[in-house]
């Protein structure tokens, strides 16, 4: 699966799995930029995928097959992503004089075990050699990005796509796909200037602090749209099944009294403000943790993606709470997509940010 990174095709098929749906994106690569060939978001039945774990691989494969057939997608090679919460991502520094074979042996057979919260033999590990620098002792070091997942996670994804009649060529981490989607925007920041990528997903929020295109800090907070919907349903005394519909119509109040939880606020506003207030506190802790790792570190902007980023005025809410400019990701605009991309409603676009990044990766 890893060796295929170096073989390229002109089309990319990206498929993202989450507890609510399967997102499918097919892009055609042209010199003038990527063109959207197909895009679909197909709901998953309840109970097939929960808390980042696959419970019914055949059920998910059925949904994938139906989506491909409906949109007349013939491609068989696919790129997908494991959730950030299922991955271990570390930046490590090793002696720069190591050649490629020595570096590979040291990373995979010695260093990896030091950073894994589970046994090395239970892990699939990959790495990327980055640049070199001089450490405080005057020794030249090479920076290496180490990425690992449990083998059972990799096997779950391989099994699903095999059942769907597809060949999974690359399984990466969701935050890497989001970085790819935002590549052009990230290039506008100065060297050493970091941004926070926040993917408000279904079962949690993925936070990545990225500098020079490389994730420096990664964390998943167990607060996602599922929790928002449940809080709204409880506040309104309505069935949980109505939470998704309620969430789509929410606009976050921004006046100064809205954060106090006063009795003049309607129950839905109080519920969502409490959840978002807790989430912004967690994001602030993550940013502060990163800033405390060294001198002259800076986080300049926040990018919001995922299905939770469609809440009205959520960008302004986080701008106020964090004191940092905050932008909702529009992957169509970020990638300058041609084709039928304009037909995708704005309210659906942030949720496709990861899938678009997967489709952008050539295999």
Residue ranges and their predicted role:
Residues 77, 81-186, 301, 331-337, ...:
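Active-site neighborhood for divalent-cation/phosphate handling
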Residues 230, 270, 274-277, 281, ...:
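Feature representing long, continuous alpha-helical segments
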Residues 234-235, 245-299:
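Adenine-nucleotide phosphate-binding core of ATP-dependent small-molecule kinases
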Residues 64-77, 164, 238, 286-301:
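Phosphate/pyrophosphate-binding loops at sites that engage ATP/ADP/AMP, CoA/4′-phosphopantetheine
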Residues 180, 309, 327-363:
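Glycine-rich phosphate-binding/hydrolytic loop that grips phosphoryl groups
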Residues 275, 297-327:
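Glycine-rich phosphate-binding loops at beta-strand->alpha-helix junctions
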